[in-house]
Amino acid sequence: ATMTLTDANFQQAIQGDKPVLVDFWAAWCGPCRMMAPVLEEFAEAHADKVTVAKLNVDENPETTSQFGIMSIPTLILFKGGRPVKQLIGYQPKEQLEAQLADVLQ
């Protein structure tokens, strides 16, 4: 399952020991809707290695502008509270796993 993030809980959520993959999305965004089931599957398959979380850009402008999100979906991987990888646009599951292989080892 994926976690829902907001401006209020964002900083706390990304501080943990486990890496957090954050999906910046919006309800009106077609590629974001395509991305949702991929992320659910990814989250279940790799729950022990990475936390998958979603942040609605329309409802959380502060965090969205803090990370300079220009196009969605944007996925950012955080480790120890710091962004270490950014993926922009729809990612099929195989591509997502290949991009994050170092985290999933």
Curated annotation (Swiss-Prot):
Annotated source species: Alicyclobacillus acidocaldarius subsp. acidocaldarius (Bacillus acidocaldarius)
GO biological process terms on file: cell redox homeostasis
Protein name according to UniProt: Thioredoxin
GO cellular component: cytosol
Disulfide partners: 29-32
Pfam families to which the protein is assigned, alphabetical: Thioredoxin
Function noted in UniProt: Participates in various redox reactions through the reversible oxidation of its active center dithiol to a disulfide and catalyzes dithiol-disulfide exchange reactions.
Domain named Thioredoxin: residues: 1-105
InterPro entries, per the entry: Thioredoxin, Thioredoxin-like_sf, Thioredoxin_CS, Thioredoxin_domain
